[in-house]
Amino acid sequence: MERELLHKLLTWKDTVGRKPLIIRGARQVGKTWLMKEFGSTYFSDLVYINFETNRTAKLLFEQGLDLARIIQGLEIQLGKSIDAKNCLLIFDEIQECPDAFTSLKYFQELFTDYYIIAAGSLLGVALHQNTSFPVGKVEFLDLYPLSFSEFLEAIGEKSLASLVSSLDWGLLSPFREKLIYHLRTYYFIGGMPEAVKTYAEKQDFFEVRVIQRRILEAYEQDFSKHAPTEVVPRIRMIWNSIPAQLAKENKKFIFGQLRQGARAKDFELAMEWLRDCGLIHKISRVSKPEMPLKAYEDFSAFKVYLLDVGILGAMVDLDARSILEGNRLFTEFRGSLTEQFVLQELITAGNTLYYWSAERGMAELDFILQDQGTVIPLEVKAEENLKAKSLKVVAENFPDTFPVRTSMSNFRRESWMTNFPLYAVSYLAKYIDLERPKS
């Protein structure tokens, strides 16, 4: 299974003055596999330490931060020497050993030859709680579920994935129906590695759904096991409400849907816990679609999405036939799935997302982002509906923007906006860069 992040890891490896690297990501998005795959492919040796299960290694760090003694102790435990320049050191579930966190500072300052990558399932929570975290001494990379492009490669469609990335619209046109079929399949499978692997090997939708439900159970167990006891009920309320929140015409998150009289301040900790775990994405409203978007952020209004479109489908129990054949059940929920998909693709591609709505609610844009000096208003259409009323409002009132509608239709450039195929939406910034006048 090819992951795009492997290329970024290789860049990190070859960077002069690199720092220890921390990979962030939700449980079961493939962090451990990625680190081991990177180590076995690009290093002559790797050392894997899981602080959740390796009590000896944990004790070595807890006894003091003399790095030479720690390395010596690890070598004794492993029964082999650790060659700093040719070995990848992997610290997994590092949140279980705060002293290992702290040691990263000293590795960066004193033992610069060592290649160190760390990760953990609840790393975001630990980062908020750990006051001795080595600020400025580490680098971060975020790992998300497989993108649609990675999914295509995993199911044996590498050439098709490459064609999509080329943005050769003429050559892509004959493969539109095939791409739409794979896209709808991705709506069901999602990007969780175990689900993708099972589908790639067996094409068994039922077994994929079993895996997704198992992942959901693991997340719910994490709520009880790792979150503060008093916050757990509120975490569950937010988590369970997300499909219904996304099914609304106006997808702004409404706390009143959780329970009567619910207030935002009562749920702040629960919301942040879910974000820190990488389980949700919180997208703020902007009051104006103008540069810089951050300056117009309205923190009181936001939308909440899940980490994965397949997990969203599993939560509402959408069956594969509904999605692939487009029956009434899918028709009712397709807008939510499509928005969830677009959000994943754009965030995985490195974009910071917002949404926009007019003060009186007369118009709303699903997403808005900026690329260099360009503001991109984005209206999402689940099928081939070419109406884009809200996009038209923005285009007329903010002429310096680059309006885009994304849908199942083919690429087309119109006088006031661009229709961009859903299957290629992760390459939207690339396309705009190509269109930008060269100085």
Listing of model-derived features with the role each one plays in the protein:
Residues 1-16:
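Pre-Walker A adenine-sensing motif
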Residues 23:
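Hydrophobic anchor at the beta1->P-loop junction of P-loop NTPases
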Residues 31:
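Conserved lysine of the Walker
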Residues 34, 38:
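Hydrophobic positions on the alpha1 helix immediately C-terminal to the Walker A/P-loop
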Residues 53-84:
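Short glycine-rich substrate-engagement loop in P-loop NTPases that contacts/grips substrate
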Residues 90, 115-121, 142:
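Structural recognition of the conserved hydrophobic beta-strand(s) that form the central parallel beta-sheet
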Residues 127-247:
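Interdomain motor-coupling "hinge/lid" segment immediately C-terminal to the ATP-binding subdomain
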Residues 197-364, 368-370:
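Accessory nucleic acid-recognition modules appended to NTPase machines
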